[in-house]
Amino acid sequence: MRISGIDAAKALQALAGRLPTPRRASLARLTDTDGGALDHALILWFPGPATATGEDLAELHLHGGRAVVAAVEAALAAMPGLRRAEAGEFTRRAFANGRIDLAEAEGLADLLAAETESQRVQALDHASGHVSRAVAGWQARLLALMAAAEAELNFADEDDVEVGEGVAQRVSEGMAALAGELGEWLARPAAEVIAEGLSVVIAGPPNAGKSTLINALAQRELAIVSPVAGTTRDVIETPLALDGIAMRFSDTAGLRGESADAIEMIGIDRAKAAVEGADILLWLGAPKEAPEHPRTILIAAQADRWRGDAAAEAEAAHCDLILSAATGEGMDRLHTMIVEMARTLLPREGEATLRQRQRDALAEAKGWLEVETGSREAGDLILLAERLRLAGATLDRITGRGGVEDMLDTLFGRFCIGK
């Protein structure tokens, strides 16, 4: 149990009768205001500001029984000045007190929600300050360019200020170089790709084995398998993780030209939309009928049914994979192919990614830094200095130094009470 704020010391003394040596675990008998025993617990005392929240902070390591926790909570609630923490309030106080910045707080939120290895790695990278350090480096370069521009504008006639010739050109070239680096970051996959999972769509004509395949991948019955064409009428989606990569697999209605069933036609339209939005397409059908898609795996499915059929064997030769979800043939190879294709959509090892909010700010900053070479503006230091200022203010939004109040409640509301 964690207590943070100006009354943390009073609360700990009231429960334990003393303040232990800072930052050392100590065994204590906890009592309520009437002297009644609550628990024997480990207590820790962290005087601010060098704490997680930047405030005085106390921790109680209790026995985990519900009655114990409830009794200690009741004792704390009876003390003046104390109240239950709101969701994410400890992290919000850390942000307000400068212990972490907004990008690190967002990384911590993602770390708490991480379910796959790739999500954990990305979130820990953000929470550890990778993005924040990059922003600090960009800001330092902006300040250097701004200093050069301001020196030329305000102090060019001073003997002790070295400005030299061609300052506007050097500043505009520095802006172009920085804009190029921001563009490289924007070209990376968005963080949401890892957080939300890649979309893998299973598509093909009716009775191609799509539902059998998604059931085999999920290792449970998600979709009805029937010899009757048109059984699947809607998109059936399930989250799966392959080799630590989050994915969303979708089974779709069989694609065919026309159907007398209006409901099936709605399902076909939804299937087509799913194919268009897929990151990876698994096509179970004739290769020549596969939709155009940059990342398609052509699958000759239901191999257990057509083995020995010369025509089917000839068509399968044009596919990437021969598979039977019923017998398991080709399933391991399909797993490998999906993972290999998925990795091409993910950031390289050690490469940080950006959330959409951060990408929007970075794109705006890049826009302020882009000035056409040889234009009048490229030679105007006053305009260049203003562009540099606006770019810096925009980058501040990534780490939470400006213009972010409207989204703080939403962010910290995602945290659990203990954070």
UniProtKB/Swiss-Prot annotation:
Give the UniProt subcellular location, in the record's own words. Cytoplasm
Q: Does the keyword Hydrolase apply?
A: yes
Q: What does this protein need as cofactor?
A: K(+)
The residues listed in the UniProt record as binding GTP, with positions renumbered to this chain, are 207-212, 226-232, 251-254
Residues engaged in binding Mg(2+):
211, 232
User: Which N-terminal residues, if any, form the signal peptide?
Assistant: none
- Might you name a Gene Ontology BP term for this protein? tRNA wobble uridine modification
Note the superkingdom of the native organism. Bacteria
Q: How the cofactor binds, per note? A: Binds 1 potassium ion per subunit.
Query: Which positions bind (6S)-5-formyl-5,6,7,8-tetrahydrofolate?
Result: 2, 59, 99, 419
- Keyword field: Cytoplasm, GTP-binding, Hydrolase, Magnesium, Metal-binding, Nucleotide-binding, Potassium, tRNA processing
Q: Where is the TrmE-type G domain?
A: 197-343
- Which GO terms of the molecular function aspect are on file? GTP binding; GTPase activity; metal ion binding
Q: What EC number(s) does the entry state?
A: 3.6.-.-
Q: Which residues bind K(+)?
A: 207, 226, 228, 231
Protein role:
Exhibits a very high intrinsic GTPase hydrolysis rate. Involved in the addition of a carboxymethylaminomethyl (cmnm) group at the wobble position (U34) of certain tRNAs, forming tRNA-cmnm(5)s(2)U34.
Q: How does it assemble?
A: Homodimer. Heterotetramer of two MnmE and two MnmG subunits.
**Protein family per UniProt:** Belongs to the TRAFAC class TrmE-Era-EngA-EngB-Septin-like GTPase superfamily. TrmE GTPase family.
What HAMAP family has UniProt attached to this entry? GTPase_MnmE
Q: What is this protein called?
A: tRNA modification GTPase MnmE
- Gene giving rise to this polypeptide: mnmE
